[in-house]
Amino acid sequence: WNVPIFAVLQRSARAVVVDCADGRVLGTAVSGYPSGERGVLLDERDPHLARQHPGDYLEALRASTRGALDAAAREPGFSRERVVGIGTDTTGSTPLPVDAACRPLALDPRWRDHPAAQAWLWKDHTAADEAAAITETARRHAPKYLAPIGGTYSSEWFWSKIWNCLKVAPDVFDAAASWVELADYVPAVLAGVTDPRDVRRCVCAAGHKAMYAAAWGGLPDRAFLARLDPRLADLRDRLYEHASPADRPA
């Protein structure tokens, strides 16, 4: 057998062990997130806020993966040594601020309870004003950035959320060495990456959510970002230059 593990992270971590030869499911397990309401951190004062604690991802991923492997171990002939890879699936855009060691700020006691230091879940809509401003600025100065994404930038996406953080929680923005999508953070942890500059960024999140395209040199240029806020232009240098398709290992 060549056996991969697939892990899906949304309101819980769901792990599946599959036989590559025939697609047969050998074991499954689910582990919920302990924080917030069914895994989501809410704010009764703001119905648009939806965050998750980054520590929940790793705790639940560990538990669900072990559970799925334990279930697979009951299959005749299965061996953990036959596991050939781990694939992950997440919802996005779910960016999170990280320190210079690629550690989420929310894992630091200083930021543990700060809403802006959490993972900004895909369905967080607190950045509606920022999304509208990005759309209008792009229409006036760089319409090419909007062409691949339907002509409108969303409050659910990368730049609008980071810009909102800069406005409402500049201390968190200043403390972040970089920002990483959940889709990139989990594989980076599994691969032992400890520097945000070394995280392999997936082209799906980068392209659709962060307006990345090789045609214009990657992320939106500094001049465009500076029209939004000069500090976003500075952040660009701490993000990434290249994004990869899903068939590249982390």
Question: What do these predicted ranges mean?
Answer:
Residues 35-38, 128-129, 249-250:
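A short acidic, often aromatic-flanked loop/helix-cap motif at beta-alpha or helix-coil junctions
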Residues 10, 20, 98, 135-250:
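Gly/Ser/Thr-rich active-site cleft segment
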Residues 48-55, 121, 152, 173:
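Charge-dense, low-complexity intrinsically disordered segments
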Residues 1-108, 233-242:
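N-terminal glycine/serine-rich phosphate-binding loop of ATP-dependent small-molecule kinases
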Residues 75-157:
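Active-site phosphate-binding/coordination module
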Residues 59, 63, 125, 129, ...:
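A structural signal for well-ordered alpha-helical segments within the folded catalytic domains
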